[in-house]
């Protein structure tokens, strides 16, 4: 008896794709990057096939994302934001400190051994008068909750036939034949293959140049804390000798819970993730010199590897890199998934315009728009986050603190400068995108039917 041929598509599909079946775009990768890419392209009217790897389930507030207002508009337009099963918390103010002793508070439980001549800090946001609208710099969302919302949206698109999920992985891709080979020997013709996977598969190693990589030999200790005071929707970041510490507001009773992202030497981060919560709280209070009050650990902690990775080319023939396949940046500025959303929305725009003009998806001039814009944005973000991650622990630390202090005083005194800095933070744009129109989805606009 002949054994049945394994299906190419997952359970949601009703039929098996035959050899050389054609699809507009094939998306490969894992996690949220692959899902949002497929959803953006489906929203633009393209037939999409997706092979993604399941992401591990996470506790709701162990890991968070800081999404820009433009990112929220995009997710609302795709009807994803409305399905989040955990509320978000807005950031209305942000304070950055060059060291713990620069934090000014009357509730400090310890005294710093070094009193700064003047504190080095930089603030975003400003007090609003009565009746004025509060400006939101970013939205803190649960990574687990967003993952579930994306999965739900993806399943809906699979059910209505706009996206087909592949159960069999891709093992090869021929750009000249516009053909992807699956592990069961089945071929699929596609105009474009988009990869979002951080670790390049063998077929991508043939098509794309090696990425530039830097391992920080550090880990981000992440989890949820409860403070002894309300967070007031304030995000705080301190450049500690061990690495940057970020405390981000999350929804909670009394508005006292915050998400922690603490960059530490990898061995220490892994050790702290395994010890008693009270010891972690003690170490955190010690590192911050008691300036931020008392902490209680809520739930389990985890460690995320810290790496910098930037692809040399975002487009190689008919292979397009997006998300983690194109860039991995230090999380201190919270720009990782914002970069991915800007990638996916712009690529959907570029391919939509390509089709409107009657050009082939592999048209070099059109794809160059995506590559030039997105690589410049990622390169600038990578350079900025890498520089900040190392600046305050380098020989230039004192000079950096002085520069931050001067800038902070200038911003506090100059209303126009403060408004300009707030506007850029609020727009969700990098410097490279200033003057360029936002992609449709980030403007809150849908594609024409």
Say what each PLM segment does:
Residues 5-8, 349-449:
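C-terminal helical "tail/cap" subdomain of flavin- and related membrane-associated enzymes
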Residues 50-51, 193, 322, 329:
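Generic enzyme active-site microenvironment
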Residues 4-11, 175-179, 300-309:
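Short gly/ser/thr-rich secondary-structure transition/capping motifs
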Residues 271-354, 361-362:
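FAD/FMN-dependent oxidoreductases across multiple families
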Residues 5-11, 17-26, 30-92, 97, ...:
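Glycine-rich FAD cofactor-binding loop and adjacent beta-loop-alpha segment at the N-terminus
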Residues 9, 18-21, 84-207, 212-220:
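Conserved N-terminal helical subregion
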Residues 75, 187, 192-293, 298-301:
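Conserved FAD-binding catalytic core of PHBH/FMO-like flavoproteins
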């Amino acid at each position: 008896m002949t054994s049945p041929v394994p299906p190419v598509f997952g359970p949601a599909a009703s039929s098996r794709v035959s050899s050389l079946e054609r699809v507009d775009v094939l998306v490969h990768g894992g996690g949220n990057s692959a899902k949002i890419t497929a959803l953006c392209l489906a929203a633009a009217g393209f037939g999409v096939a997706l092979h993604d790897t399941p992401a591990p389930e996470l506790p709701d507030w162990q890991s968070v994302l800081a999404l820009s207002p433009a990112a929220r508009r995009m997710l609302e337009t795709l009807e994803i934001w409305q399905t989040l099963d955990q509320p978000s918390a807005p950031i209305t103010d942000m304070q950055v400190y060059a060291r713990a002793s620069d934090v000014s508070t009357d509730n400090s439980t310890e005294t710093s051994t070094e009193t700064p001549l003047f504190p080095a800090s930089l603030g975003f946001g400003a007090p609003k008068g009565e009746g004025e609208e509060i400006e939101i710099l970013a939205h803190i969302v649960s990574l687990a909750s967003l993952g579930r919302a994306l999965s739900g949206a993806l399943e809906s698109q699979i059910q209505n036939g706009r996206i087909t999920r592949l159960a069999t992985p891709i093992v090869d891709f021929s750009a000249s034949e516009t053909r992807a080979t699956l592990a069961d020997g089945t071929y699929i013709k596609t105009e474009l293959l988009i990869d979002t996977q951080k670790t390049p598969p063998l077929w991508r190693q043939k098509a794309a140049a090696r990425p530039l990589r830097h391992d920080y030999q550090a880990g981000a200790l992440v989890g949820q804390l409860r403070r002894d005071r309300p967070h007031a929707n304030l995000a705080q970041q301190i450049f500690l000798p061990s690495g940057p510490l970020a405390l981000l507001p999350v929804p909670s009773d009394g508005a006292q819970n915050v998400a922690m992202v603490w960059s530490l030497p990898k061995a220490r981060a892994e050790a702290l993730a395994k010890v008693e919560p009270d010891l972690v709280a003690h170490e955190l209070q010690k590192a911050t010199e008691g300036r931020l009050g008392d902490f209680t650990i809520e739930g389990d902690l985890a460690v995320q590897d810290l790496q910098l990775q930037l692809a040399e080319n975002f487009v190689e023939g008919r292979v397009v890199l997006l998300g983690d396949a194109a860039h991995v940046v230090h999380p201190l500025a919270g720009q990782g998934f914002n970069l991915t959303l800007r990638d996916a929305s712009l690529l959907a725009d570029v391919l939509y315009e390509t089709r409107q003009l009657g050009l082939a998806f592999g048209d070099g001039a059109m794809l160059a728009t995506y590559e030039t814009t997105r690589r410049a944005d990622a390169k600038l973000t990578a350079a900025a986050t890498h520089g900040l991650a190392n600046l305050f622990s380098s020989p230039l630390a004192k000079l950096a603190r002085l520069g931050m202090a001067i800038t902070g005083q200038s911003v506090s005194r100059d209303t126009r400068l403060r408004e300009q800095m707030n506007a850029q933070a609020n727009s969700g744009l990098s410097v490279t995108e200033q003057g360029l129109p936002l992609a449709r989805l980030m403007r809150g606009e849908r594609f024409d039917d």
